[in-house]
Amino acid sequence: MGLIKKIFGTHSEREIKLIRPTADKIEALEPDMMKLSDDELRGKTIEFKNRLKNGETLDDILVEAYAVVREAAKRTLGNRAYYVQLLGGIILHQGRISEMRTGEGKTLTSTFPAYLNALEGEGVHIVTVNDYLAKRDAEWMGEVHRFLGLSVGCILNDMDNDERRKAYNCDITYATNNELGFDYLRDNMVIYKEQLVMRDLHFAIIDEVDSVLIDEARTPLIISGQSGKSTRLYEACDILARQLTKGTAKELSKMDIIMKEDDQETGDFVVNEKEKAVNLTAEGVEKVERFFKIENLADPENLEIQHNIILALRAHYLMAIDKDYVVKDDEVLIVDDFTGRIMPGRRYSDGLHQAIEAKEHVKVKRESKTLATITFQNFFNKYTKKCGMTGTALTEENEFREIYGMDVVEVPTNRPVARIDKDDAVYRTKREKLNAVINAIVEAHKAGQPVLVGTITIEASEEISELLKKKNIPHKVLNAKFHELEAEIIADAGQKGAVTIATNMAGRGTDIKLGEGVTELGGLKIIGTERHESRRIDNQLRGRSGRQGDPGESCFYICLEDDLMRLFGSERLNTIFKSLGLPEGEQIEHKMLSGAIEKAQKKIEDNNFGIRKNLLEYDKVNNEQREIIYAERRKVLNGDSMRDVIFKMITDNVETCVNTSISDDQLPEEWDLAELNQMLLPIIPMEPVELKDNELRHMKRNELIHMLKEKAVKLYEEKEAEFPEKEHLREVERVVLLRVIDRKWMDHIDDMDQLRQGIGLQAYGQRDPKTEYKFSGFEMFDTMINAITEDTVKALMHVRIEQKVEREEVAKVTGTNRDESVAKAPVKRATKKVQPNDPCPCGSGKKYKHCCGGVGRI
C-alpha cells in the first residue's frame, strides 16, 4: 500500500492535481480583474445571471466568477485569497469535503462556492456551529457578497417568523445547523401557507462538517410539547437508587461458559462502563419489589418502574456533574462531549434528564411529547447539493462517503507546517501525570512561551486551575461554565506568557494569533491532558498551534488511569510496568503504548460509526414515512384540489366500512347491516341502512357500495351548499385535514418510539430486528393513514357554519435539541356550553355525547 502511494500519490494528491489547471486559470485572470472599476466588477453578477439563463452552466462560468470574488474580497476586506483557498473553493463547488488546516482561511474559502451557486437564485445556506459565528461571518464575509450585488441574511435564535422569512429569501443565508433543522420541522407543522419561512433546500456549505454530520449525527432534532405524565416516580426511584449497593460481576471466560458457570454477581446492581449500561442483580430486583410493594418487577405493568430505576442508577453512576452536565440556575444543562459547550434547551430523552434532575434535587420537569423530529443525517441529505469544510475529516473519510456520499480531499497548506508534534508522555498514575503537566506549564511560562492546555472535562480543567493557583501562575479557564468569554479568551491565548486551560477545542471557530516575540520563543505550546476517544478531536487540539507556517509544539500527557486506557486494556500494561520497578514520576516510553492508545481510539471510533450506521438504518423507515406525510401535507397546504381529496376520502370510508362488515363471499340475506350502521353512521351521519327482503335479494355488494357512496356524497354536497362562499369550506377542509394529520403523526411518532424500544426482543425469536421494525412500522403507518381519512371525514361531516376556524401558531423552539413548549390556554367561546346529555344543537334528535360531542371539535 505504501509503495502504491509513493508511485501514484494519495487520493487527495491525485484530486488536487486534476483541479490545479482550473485554479491556474483563475490566477491568470487577476490582472484583468484589477483593471475593472467597482461598478464594472459589480456588473459581472448580472452578466453571469444572464449567461446562466442563456444555457451556460455554473462550471462554464466558475473561473471568471471565482476571479471576480477574489478581487472583491481584496477590495472590501483587504484579503487576497491564497492559491490553496481557490483549490478549496473548487472542491466545495463539486459537493465534496475540503480538509483545510486551522488558520488556512476556511471562512474566506466559502465565499467562492457561495457566490457561484447563489447566481442560480435558489438560495445558499452557509452552516455554522453557533449563533456567534453565523452573525460574525454574515457581517464579515457578507461585505464581499453585498459589494457584488447579492443579498445576505442571517438566522439567529431570537428572530420571529417575518425576520426568518426575509433572511431565507436572501441569496446567501448564514445559520446554525440547529436553526435550519428546526425551521424545516416548524414549516412542516404550519396551518397556513403564509406561515412558511424557508425555501427549498438547494445548496449547503457546512463549516466544521465533522462536528455537524458526525459528532451530532446521533442526536435527533426534536420539537416537543409537555405531556401530562407525573414526575413522582423519578423522585421515588432516586430515593431507592441511593439505598442500593453497587456490586461487581465477574466476566466469564470461555472455559466458564463451556462449564456452564453462572455469573458471579454481588450487590444490588452492576455497572458496565464500557457499554455504559446498568443491570440489577437478583438481590436488587427483590429490593425494588419490596420498595414498590409489587410481586414481579418483570410483569408488563411494572415496566415503567423497571425503566425508571435503571435511569436513576445511570444518573448516579454513569452521568457525572461538570463532565456530562452542569447545574445552573436550578436547571440541569447538558455539556457537549465533543466541544465542551453548554447546550441550552437540549434535554436527554427517555426520562434520563428527569432522573438527573431528581439526583441533583432541582425541579423535575415533566416528560415531553414529540411533535416533530429529524436527524441531521436525514436533514442534510435533503439538500440538492451539499459540501463541507473542516480541519480534520480524513479519519472519518469512509463514513462521509458511505452515509453522505461525500468525498474528502485534503488541501495542501499555504506554508509548510512547522509545528513539532511530540510523542505521548505516559505515566503510571494520574498524580504523576498532573505533576508533569504542571512542571511543563511552569517551565514554558517562565520562558514567556504561551501555553494552551486541553482537557476533556470541566472537572479536569478546574483541577489544573487549582494546581496552577498554588504555583502562582496567572491563567484563564475556558469551559462550559464560562463560554460567554470564549472569543476574548481565545484571542489572547497566543500572547507572550499566556496560559489558557480549555475543555475540548472542537468548533471554537476563533484563530489563535501569536503575539509579538512569541515566534522566537517557539510559538504556541499545546498540552493535552488526556487522549479523547476520537483521534479527530485530538488532531483539532493540535491544530490550534502552527497556523500559517507559525512555529509551535504539541504533546499529550496520559496515564494508565485515564478512562480510555482503563476501559481498553491497560490492566496488562499496568502489570508489565509494575514489574519493571520504575521510580515514581518517571515517564514511560514503550512502543506497545502508542499502539495500545491508537488501537483503543480506533476501537471506539469503529463502535461509534456502527452505532450511527445502525441508527440511520432504523431512521430510514421513519424518514420514508416522514417524506410521505410532509409531501401530502404540503399539497394540502397549497390547496391542491381539496374538494376532490375530501370526496375521495368520503367514498373510501364507505368502501372500507362495507368491506369490513360484509365479506365478499356472504349472501345478501347474511349481510350484517346492524354492524355496518354501527361502523358507518358515527363517521357519516346518514339515514341508517335498511333494506327490505326483495331489495336484498336483487342487490350485489358492489351495488350497495355504489348506493352508499352516492348518499354520502349527496350529504356532503348539502353541507357544501350551507356555505355562501365555497372557498370558506375549502379553508375549513384544509385546516381540519392538517390538524388531523398532525395529531395522528404525533401519535405515530410515539408508537414508532415504543416499537423501536421493544424490537430488540425479536432477536430472541430468531428474527432480524431491523426487518421486523420495517414490517411493523409500515403496518402501523397504513393504520395511521386510514385513521386520518376516517377522522377527517367524521369532523367535516359534523362541521357547522357558525364555527370559526382558529389559526394556530406553531410553538417556537428555543433549544438545541428539544423545546419544552408551554401548554396553550384553551380557546374561549362566547356560546353557552352544551352538556353531554343535552339534545345536540345540530337538530339530529340525539344526545350531544352520541352526536357532535363524540367527534373532534374545530
Curated annotation (Swiss-Prot):
Function per UniProt: Part of the Sec protein translocase complex. Interacts with the SecYEG preprotein conducting channel. Has a central role in coupling the hydrolysis of ATP to the transfer of proteins into and across the cell membrane, serving as an ATP-driven molecular motor driving the stepwise translocation of polypeptide chains across the membrane.
Q: Which NCBIfam families match?
A: PRK09200.1, PRK12904.1, secA
How does this polypeptide assemble, per the annotation? Monomer and homodimer. Part of the essential Sec protein translocation apparatus which comprises SecA, SecYEG and auxiliary proteins SecDF. Other proteins may also be involved.
Q: What is its EC number?
A: 7.4.2.8
Q: List the GO terms this entry assigns under cellular component, sorted alphabetically.
A: cell envelope Sec protein transport complex; cytosol; plasma membrane
Q: How is the cofactor bound?
A: May bind 1 zinc ion per subunit.
The alphabetical list of record keywords is: ATP-binding, Cell membrane, Cytoplasm, Membrane, Metal-binding, Nucleotide-binding, Protein transport, Translocase, Translocation, Transport, Zinc
Q: How does it sit in the membrane?
A: Peripheral membrane protein
Q: Which domain of life is it from?
A: Bacteria
The organism encoding this protein is Lachnoclostridium phytofermentans (strain ATCC 700394 / DSM 18823 / ISDg)
Which gene does this sequence derive from? secA
The protein here is known as Protein translocase subunit SecA
Respond yes or no to whether keyword Cell membrane is given for this record.
Answer: yes
Which GO-annotated molecular functions does the record name?
A: ATP binding; metal ion binding; protein-exporting ATPase activity
Q: What is its main location?
A: membrane
Instruction: Identify its protein family.
Output: Belongs to the SecA family.
